[in-house]
Each structure stands twice: as C-alpha cells, then as structure tokens.
Amino acid sequence: MGRVRTKTVKRAARQIVEKYYGKLGLDFQYNKKVAEEVALIPSKRMRNKVAGFITHLMRRIQKGPVRGISLKLQEEERERRMDYIPEKSELEVPVIQVDQDTADMLNFLKISLPNLKVMSFNAHEHRERH
C-alpha cells in the first residue's frame, strides 16, 4: 500500500519540475541526483521522497497535462491549439440548405449569407429519411 505524501514534498517536487523540467527524466536515481543539486533538502529521507514524487509527476506529464504544473511546452501547445485556423471555412460551401424557420432567424439576427437556399421540409419527408 502507498503512503500519503506531505504538502511540503508535493510543493517542492512541483517547483523543481517547473524549473528544471529539461534535466529530469523517468529514472528515480537520476532525479534524486538532480534534486540534490538544485535544491537544499534537509535530509536524505526527504530528498528521496521528493525525488520519488518528481518521478511520479514526470510519468503523469508524459500522459498529458498535469493540474498545478505549468510548463512552457504545455503553454505553447495550448496556445497553438487555441490559435488554430482551419484552411477551409465551413461556410464556404456551394449551397447552404436551410428551412424557413432558420432563414427567418438569420434574417432577424441580420445575418446574410450569399449561398443560402431556403428549402421546404415537410415533417412527413423528414421522418421517412431517418
């Protein structure tokens, strides 16, 4: 069974991961040496706990974004997704077929689309198609 990690261990590990992400890996022994170099950890036992949690966080980071840790790589990836502009607009189709109710709503909102075509749909036809 696992043990509960203290707030101190978690906070220290998160700060080390944020600042020294490039130096860390998935190996506990290597992370232990890096933690010893970059931080003043008072005891061997505390250092091992911090290194263990660093290794745990690194595994989680590989799977996806981790709450409470902001890495520049993740921030850039998120911004890239937010700024994505599709090559072809969904509105650039030859004809947009809508029913009369939708056309009335667009007119009410003062939205004019050049390729809009109003079609008459019957409830009976709609049921037969599905």
UniProtKB/Swiss-Prot annotation:
GO terms classed as biological process = translation
- Spell out the Pfam families in the cross-references: Ribosomal_S17e
Name one cellular component (GO) term: ribonucleoprotein complex
Under InterPro entries, the record lists:
Ribosomal_eS17, Ribosomal_eS17_CS, Ribosomal_eS17_sf
Q: Does the keyword Ribonucleoprotein apply?
A: yes
Q: Which UniProt keywords apply?
A: Ribonucleoprotein, Ribosomal protein
Q: Its Gene Ontology molecular function terms?
A: structural constituent of ribosome
Among Gene3D superfamilies, the record links this protein to: Ribosomal protein S17e-like
- Give the family per the record: Belongs to the eukaryotic ribosomal protein eS17 family.
Under PANTHER family, the record lists: 40S RIBOSOMAL PROTEIN S17 (PTHR10732:SF0)
Q: What is this protein called?
A: Small ribosomal subunit protein eS17
The species this protein was found in: Theileria parva
